[in-house]
Amino acid sequence: VIEPIRVASDNGGQLQLQRLGAAPTSGPVVLLLHGAMSDSRVFLPAEHGLARYLAEQGCCVYVADLRGHGDSQPALGGPQPIRMSDLLQADIPALLEWLRSEHPDQRLFVVSHGWGGVWLAAALIRKPQLLASICGLVQLGVRRRALAGGRFTRFARRCIWGALASIAGRFKGRIPACSMGLGSHDESVDVHTVCLAWERGEWRDLEDGFDYASALKSLAWPPSLYLAGDRDRVLGHMQDVRRFAHELGRHDAQVILLEKGRGCSRHYGHTDLLTHPQAEQDHFPLIADWLAQRQQPTHTQELFPRCSAADVEGAAYIT
């Protein structure tokens, strides 16, 4: 059973949450957060998906849509523009604060996909008081910088994701991700512009100049699990995912490559690591086990040291 919930956010936001599973007494409370050019459907494909799987394992699961996505308001293309600052400073904090009030005695896990993991990290860096309620993070195909890959990969990122999408956005007033085959949901021009700037350069806010990388240095980051598909060459390359884990500093982290023949029955890309039915046998159990282990108060942290870019390039994958 899926229960729809509305959560109020600043600047006129009305966010859709979908709850699966009964309110738990001991199981993990899990928020699922989509990324750019996507929405909550990535966690809820027909008759399967990560949201349903985790609910069946005893988790209380909340699937979110940020403004401009799904049925949340304001909608994309309406009179009110969708800006990155709304997502980071209004929507994500509103969701976390609502969950904290709904489950005051339980700690929260957040599972993010793609750019959703970077948005979540930025929101937490801006409002570090929210970190106290978070028990752990699962990052699926999440990276900030886009440096890895060969010539074709770099061409696809710069020309299709970058230049062509930006030109189309200027004409249409939105990034037509669906018609361009870039995603399952059209995207805000401002959100896309900020993502492009972040993947090519410094992690700095384009509106007020807030330096996320500098502010991050004083924070203790939550335990995190990072997964990347071996066929994800453009949006979540393993080397870029690992680089993002290092960027977040010294913390309890596992970085895992989902690779055919090494624990997985098939190759996985950026989206089908969530939507393919076989994921329920390949790596969804890994996610559920990680959540259960990190919820235990006796869990011992394994620190993931900060390394240079050269160290990241030559590092062995943790599998």
Where are each of the predicted segments found?
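Short, surface-exposed "cap/lid" segments of acyl-processing enzymes
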Residues: 23-70, 74-75
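Alpha/beta-hydrolase-fold enzymes
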Residues: 105, 111, 115-203
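Conserved alpha/beta-hydrolase "acid-adjacent" motif
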Residues: 233-239
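N-terminal cap/lid segment of alpha/beta-hydrolase-fold proteins
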Residues: 1-22
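Short beta-to-alpha linker loops that shape the active-site pocket of alpha/beta-hydrolase fold enzymes
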Residues: 65-69, 143, 261
